[in-house]
A protein has these predicted regions:
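Short amphipathic alpha-helices in soluble, non-transmembrane regions
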Residues: 95-103
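A general structural signal for short secondary-structure boundary/capping elements
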Residues: 56, 140-146, 187-195
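Catalytic cores of NTP-dependent nucleotidyl/adenyl transfer enzymes across multiple folds
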Residues: 151-232, 236, 240, 254, ...
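Conserved catalytic core of two-metal-ion nucleotidyltransferases
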Residues: 104-127, 131-151
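Helical scaffold of the NTase/Pol beta-like nucleotidyltransferase catalytic core
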Residues: 2-69, 229, 265
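Active-site nucleotide-donor binding segment shared across nucleotidyl transfer reactions
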Residues: 55-94
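Intrinsically disordered, low-complexity terminal tails and inter-domain linkers enriched
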Residues: 5-28, 121-136, 227-265
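Short, well-ordered coil/turn elements that cap or connect secondary structure elements
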Residues: 61-63, 101, 138
Length: 265
């Protein structure tokens, strides 16, 4: 039984909740692991089935370090969301050339960073039968390849902070962030910044929380009237964020989960 997971929300079919690695007093969540996905909601289990069928192991033979930093890792993905994987490799161009020969689409993003993209069909039957929408029957994968240590990259740092905020504020906050994701199309970072009243570029605003004690932050569940009358005036502007821009990182202060979710079968 995995007892180091935070468990939040349920999906539209009342299936098991989303899960993610909980923070500990001495360490932030470990996004290198995949095991927790097997105990999550249907989309998390679908991604686990695909990645553990050979994709992850194949990448691991080439990479010095890897991490899954998709919003799926914290249950905030939408149909069509990518599986974003950070890959540390000493020669990203060489890595890109090798995988381009295997059907991956490679593009040079500059700064010794390469992006590789490929779409895989779902392997689990429940995903394949989920509907006629192609986005729900396949997984787009994006590999961000760089020689930089993955824990210094924005993708790792953003996901760590978002997980800590979900753990800090719980299920109601999770549902409100997911509502903004699904109904208004906001990125996870932008949705959280709106709810917390953080102005400016949401990606930069979120990283500023690395220097703060998250226990000092406050958030109040909006009333139903607030949800329907909100004009979005406090919403941060839309910005593009690369998961691999590296800057000096401090360890976020994350509360420890008191939950011990029972894994699904």
């Amino acid at each position: 039984m995995l007892t180091d997971l935070c468990r939040l929300g349920t999906d539209k079919t009342a299936a098991p909740a989303a899960v993610f690695p909980s923070a500990s007093p001495t360490a932030s969540p470990n996004w290198r692991r995949l095991d927790y996905l097997a105990h999550g909601n249907p989309r998390q289990r679908s991604a686990h089935a695909l990645l553990t069928a050979g994709v992850w192991d194949e990448l691991a033979t080439q990479c010095a370090d890897m991490a899954l930093v998709s919003t799926l890792a914290i249950g905030l993905d939408r149909p069509g969301s990518d599986l974003d994987i950070l890959c540390q490799h000493p020669n990203p161009a060489e890595f890109a050339a090798t995988f381009a020969e295997q059907g991956w689409q490679a593009s040079d993003k500059g700064g010794n960073i390469w992006l590789l993209e490929r779409t895989f069909a779902c392997l689990d039957q429940s995903c394949a039968n989920s509907g006629s929408d192609k986005s729900e029957a396949s997984w787009p994968l994006e590999l961000y390849v760089t020689p930089a240590p993955i824990e210094t990259l924005n993708g790792w740092r953003h996901l760590t902070l978002m997980a800590a905020l979900l753990e800090r504020f719980g299920d109601a906050f999770y549902r409100d962030v997911l509502r903004l994701r699904l109904e208004e199309g906001l990125k996870g970072e932008a949705a959280m910044c709106r709810l917390l009243g953080l102005a400016g570029d949401p990606y930069e605003a979120l990283l500023m929380l690395e220097e703060r004690n998250l226990a000092e932050l406050s958030w109040q569940l909006p009333s139903r009237d607030d949800i329907h009358t909100s004009t979005g005036a406090a919403a941060p502007a839309a910005h593009y964020s690369s998961p691999v821009v590296s800057t000096t990182s401090a360890t976020p202060v994350c509360p420890v989960s008191t939950e011990s979710p029972i894994p699904t079968s």
